[in-house]
Regions:
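Short, well-structured N-terminal submotif of metal-dependent ribonuclease cores
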Residues: 1-38, 51-66, 109, 118-119, ...
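Hydrophobic side chains within alpha-helical segments
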Residues: 9, 47, 99-103
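Short secondary-structure boundary/hinge segments and terminal tails
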Residues: 46, 66, 85-86, 123-125
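Short acidic, glycine/proline-rich loop/turn micro-motifs
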Residues: 48-50, 88-89
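Active-site neighborhoods of divalent-metal-dependent phosphate/nucleic-acid chemistry enzymes
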Residues: 55-61, 69-118
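Basic, glycine-rich
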Residues: 128-130
Length: 133
């Protein structure tokens, strides 16, 4: 199974947060599972750090490199098909551009999105894994 980690799931997984549920943690740790993250999430983390809303265990650039290695993550490129899909998603879906891009990428590339975001979990047009279960 291929998983696209939502921004908060990436943070929780690397920082060892107990918010990440047992079922999700097990699913992501299966050796054959592919774990992907988007540069959109890096942008969101950078915004949170810049606003002082979160503190990371090291500077952001180092954090990204360390987490990619430790969690065996791959980057999913932001492609034209996903960008188009972000604004042609089956409705209803909310207007957050980052969520739209993540959901679109998951749909276009056949990924399951690991998230605790209730708006994404309740959206019936993308495969998801509840991050807090």
């Amino acid at each position: 199974v291929k998983y696209l980690l939502d921004t908060h799931v990436w943070i929780w997984a690397f920082e060892g947060s107990n918010r990440l549920g047992t079922k999700c943690r097990k699913a992501l740790s299966v050796p054959s599972a592919e774990r992907l993250v988007s540069p959109v999430s890096t942008m969101e983390i950078a915004r949170l750090v810049a606003r002082g809303e979160i503190e990371l265990s090291c500077p952001l650039q180092e954090w990204v490199a360390r987490s990619m290695t430790a969690l065996k993550l791959r980057t999913i490129e932001l492609d034209h098909a996903s960008a188009i899909e972000a604004y042609t998603l089956p409705q209803p879906f909310h207007q957050d551009p980052a969520d739209r891009l993540l959901v679109a990428a998951a749909r276009v590339h056949g990924l399951r999105i690991a998230t605790a975001d209730s708006r994404i979990l309740q959206y019936g047009s993308v495969a998801s894994l509840h991050a807090q279960k």
